[in-house]
Amino acid sequence: MSDRKDGAGAPAARAFLAILDRNLRDLYPGYPAFVMATGIISNALYFLEMFGLSQLFFVINLVAYPILMTAIAIRLVRHTAALWADLLNPRLVFSFFTIVAATDVLGIQCDLRGYANASIALWLFAFTTWFVLLYFSFAVLSFLNTALDANVVHGGWLIAIVGTQSLVLLGVRVADHWIAYSTGLIVLAHMLWGIGLALYAIFVTLFSYRTFFFKLTPDDLSPLLWVVMGAAAISANAGTSLLLSGAHVPYLTSMNPFVDGVTLIVWAWGTWWIPLLVFFGVWKHVVCRVPLSYSPALWSLVFPLGMYSVATFRFSLASQFPFLGYLGREFIWVAVPAWLATACAMIVSNLRGLKKSNMSRDCQGRPGQLPSG
């Protein structure tokens, strides 16, 4: 009888491995946004002194991050062609910057809990990945982009800015641990902040041109649209981190009024986008009646909500505007339900996909059997 069970279990195991392998082959390159969304909510709750909830999200990331990095590594080895196809696609290549941002967000989580060595290692990995991806992605855009107009532009491109500014956020913290390199790291953080702002100005100009002066369809209004707001929010948060870093470099200290003013502008710009993005969502799902469904890109909507909460709360500390602190504290209760809803949708979607695959396997295994009834 045990032999019969083993014989029945072997095909099931092979089928499961085949499904897993297929999912790895088709893995969405922006899936690390799950770690980004989970981590930023954890950090927001930590700053708001809700340490128990924050720790729960931290534990989730401690499990999710190595799983996702392992999945990406396996995809690189087993499905190299599929990975390269995504890397060489101008519409997808910038999604790989979620690896940078996810690593930095986890690094901040570690640093808040006193794991300095882990945060340093994660920052070094994130910076190296960012450096390679930045020049590679612009090479793809320059030499492999066959689109002759702005239709190739979408909100996902701005994940490159999110990755850049996340290096600032963790880099400022790493500077406190690497005393010998502290000044250099703070200077580098200011440089990265400036690069992120320059890239944001370029991309958001192209994106706004595409959005406001071309015909929009419901398919154009994906959750990645929210990265436009998220990139502004993380730029404001990075500026706040520079202001609060207390760097004793005369030249950089003299730049504080400029950093303060630009931080206010990008925070206001990100705030301006929120009602418009909600309106776009209503138009797509209510007016055009496109049903809500789960896709991994939804995590790129959750992350900006959490980042806006953190950016607003921390900017209130730097600017000494108490009402912004209240707004930041309350906005986290928009982000947390969004995370919970997306997580539930992800679980249900994956279970349905697994059930569908099992049903397909069963039908293939019994080709001569007719359906009953």
Residue ranges and their predicted role:
Residues L24-L45, S95-L106, G155-R173, V228-S241, ...:
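The first (N-terminal) embedded transmembrane alpha-helix
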Residues F51-A126:
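Membrane helical hairpin/interfacial module
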Residues L17-F34, A85-V93, S142-T164, L192, ...:
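Cytoplasm-facing juxtamembrane segments at the starts of transmembrane helices
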Residues W84-R91, I108-T164, L169-W193, F214-P218:
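Membrane-interface helix-loop-helix junctions at boundaries between adjacent transmembrane segments
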Residues A37, S42-N43, I67-A71, R75, ...:
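C-terminal transmembrane-bundle signature of multipass membrane proteins
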Residues S2-A73, R78:
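N-terminal signal-anchor module of multipass membrane proteins
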Residues A160-F280:
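Generic multipass alpha-helical transmembrane bundles of integral membrane proteins
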Residues L56-M69, S119-V132, V187-Y200, T263-W272, ...:
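Structural signature of hydrophobic alpha-helical transmembrane segments
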